C-alpha cells in the first residue's frame, strides 16, 4: 500500500508507543523468515522495504504521561513520528495536571526533541504551522 501511496501518513491516536520498538523488530524478523515461501507458495510479491521501514516512514504515534520508556526508545521510531497526547476529555487524561506530567515525561530530553514531541510534530502533521496558533507555538520553540 505504501509503495502505491508514498505520501500516505497514518496517525495511531491512543495507541501508546512503548510496544512499537519490539513490534518493529518482530515484524522484520518474521517477514525475513517467511517471505521466500510466501512468495513461492502464495504468490505474494516481496515488499520493496522492510516492514519497520514502512512504519518509520508512514506511521505516527501518540505518547502519554506514563510512557517514559517510550520516550527513552524514541530513536527506534523517530522523533518526528511521535506526538504528545493528554487523552482529554477521557477519565485517564492528564488534565488538569498536564504540565507536571509533561515535565516528568520530557525530563532530560534535548530541548528540540521535547518541543517536537510536545507540539512541533502535531503542527507539522496536521498542517497547522502557518496558522496564528501554530506561529505562536513555534515562537516558543527552543532556539
Feature locations, PLM:
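Aromatic-lined glycan-binding groove of carbohydrate-active enzymes
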Residues: 4-52, 56
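Mid-to-C-terminal alpha-helical segments outside catalytic/metal-binding sites
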Residues: 8, 18-19, 38-41, 47, ...
